[in-house]
Amino acid sequence: MDISRAEQRILHLLAQGGRIELVRDDTRKIEKITLYTRDGWIFGGLDLLTFRKLKQKRAIASSGGKPYRITTRGLELVRGELDNR
């Protein structure tokens, strides 16, 4: 399954130890999505559409109310790059 360049970039950051945190409103709808790199920087290239695509492809998952992390399926989808850890 091919993934877009934006999805590839996000999965690459998550594979290096990043996380996606959500802020929800009172009706449990997503209000804000923030992608943090492993160094604590905020990556601004994640939007709701890309988040939903990655979730639909089961490349990211959250358990127990924790931030979203990359799954083993996501690791299979991400193409290897030299600076992956």
Swiss-Prot record:
Family from the record: Belongs to the UPF0386 family.
Origin species: Agrobacterium fabrum (strain C58 / ATCC 33970)
Coiled coil: none
Pfam family, one: YjhX_toxin
Superkingdom of the source species: Bacteria
Protein name per the record: UPF0386 protein Atu1321
